[in-house]
């Protein structure tokens, strides 16, 4: 397979040009490994130019090594040819911790800046811990959204992050953030797939010019937070069979047609290639209609963030009922 060219989200005042498919690096239990670094390097060889990491995942060093090796091999001319997203974990989401935590992420990455820096969850836990799950007694009673965002804006002002955004924010929380943000969030990264289409959130993001980025596009089957609902869907299976595509490709193409950025996660080379083979065909109106009628169910509930001593007493509080 020749190196693929991945379409990009056009640059805007909020966001640098962003490849529409990114390679995720979260593997549970969270750990760095030579296997991860090798897979990321192979992904670069195949044409991937967008990599999604986080302090929690323990893979910032893997991204650093893969990008540095890709430059040494001439696969990319420089770090600037790669789009890197990272996220600040809840233990660093204290007003005075954001900038130091961003600098630590950059040290881990061996980079002067990230293209996109995200607030990982709208929640705060005791500083110094990067465990998940975490002891629920470490949950702070409130999430200082404005204080944290001012720190994110400072990261942007200092050039530590070319763009800033959020992850796992409901439509209501995103609107709350937009009400006071000086530097607006460029992106919101959330669970997204045909069985959890995020219709309400998508509407808000489109209206406000916030790029929607979707993780678990295939439902994350086999992980503690995923389900088999997507991969076991008879409707998606039938569409795939009719088109001569895989079920995974149907899911990814559907998200691509919605205008989303897709975050895929596989270290299998054949599936890496398959994930890039979605750009020269499209779903029919009838197929899109069938997908729109699929029953909806959230995979990642966020129950870890629900506790009596925190801001979210039930799952509905975390997601604001949406």
From Swiss-Prot:
GO CC aspect terms: cytosol
MF-aspect GO terms: aldose reductase (NADPH) activity
Highest taxon of the lineage: Eukaryota
Active site per UniProt: 57
Record key words, sorted: NAD, NADP, Oxidoreductase
SUPFAM superfamilies hit by this protein: NAD(P)-linked oxidoreductase (SSF51430)
EC class name: oxidoreductase
InterPro entries per UniProt: AKR (IPR020471), AKR4A/B (IPR044497), Aldo/ket_reductase_CS (IPR018170), NADP_OxRdtase_dom (IPR023210), NADP_OxRdtase_dom_sf (IPR036812)
Residues where NADP(+) binds: 216-275
Site, as annotated: Lowers pKa of active site Tyr: 87
Residue sites binding substrate per the record: 120
Assigned EC number: 1.-.-.-
Purpose: May play a role in auxin-induced cell growth by generating hydroxyl radicals, which tends to increase cell wall loosening.
Family: Belongs to the aldo/keto reductase family.
Protein name, UniProt field: Probable NAD(P)H-dependent oxidoreductase 2
Organism of derivation: Oryza sativa subsp. japonica (Rice)
